[in-house]
Design a protein with these regions (language model features):
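Pyridoxal 5′-phosphate
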Residues: 1-199
Length: 199
């Protein structure tokens, strides 16, 4: 229930709340949170929104501006399949001037220029260059097609295992509330025993 989830966030807001952090897709159970609903409520109260898209970016078809977040960080090595250590920072244009990198940006950098965050020192240029190839590959497949395939695979295995009465799925089966990841348990088994058996 999107309204109930949103209420859990809004009930924790106070007059002192300046920023809310929302995990778009929870990594351990695969549940998708109603990020835009929560963000809309936060904005009504003057609260900035940070959206963690580490497990949603490149997985399903959405656009960051449509979530109404002010800031977002993501790992590009997950569902976008870029190299390890690559990531992306998104800051809404009108918020850029309010944030500065921990390492000093060049003096020539304007305060409202997102490139002020690119002063990273020594880094892997090979990894950076490979991001473009990963984006190209993702675009060849297509976001919607990729999402449909991943949903099919998750639904396939969850439907198979739930035929066993000892198996329980703890992730929503509603496509609006989950995508690729699902959490399961087996009666009489500890989570670490399931992990050891499967992996």
């Amino acid at each position: 229930d999107d309204a109930a989830i949103t209420k859990q966030f809004t009930s924790a807001f106070t007059d002192k709340t300046k920023v809310v952090h929302i995990t778009h897709m929870i990594n351990w159970n695969g549940n998708l949170l109603p990020a835009k609903m929560i963000a809309d409520e936060a904005k009504k109260r003057g609260i900035d929104v940070i959206l963690d898209t580490a497990h949603s970016f490149g997985l399903f078809d959405f656009k960051l501006p449509d979530t109404n977040c002010d800031y977002s960080g993501t790992s590009l090595h997950k569902f976008l399949c870029a190299p390890f250590g690559s990531g992306m920072l998104y800051i809404k244009k009108d918020k850029i001037k309010n944030i500065w990198p921990l390492l000093s940006a060049p003096e020539t950098q304007k305060e409202d220029d997102i490139r002020k965050f690119e002063n990273l020192g020594t880094r892997s240029f090979a990894s950076e260059m490979a991001i473009g190839a990963a984006v190209d590959f993702h675009n060849v497949i297509g976001s919607k097609r990729k999402e449909e395939r991943i949903r099919f695979l998750k639904n396939y295995w969850t439907e198979k295992v739930t035929k066993n009465p000892k198996v329980k799925i703890h992730t929503s089966t509603n496509p609006k509330h989950s995508c690729a990841i699902a959490l399961m348990s087996i009666e009489g088994w500890k989570p670490e025993d399931i992990e050891a058996k499967l992996l």
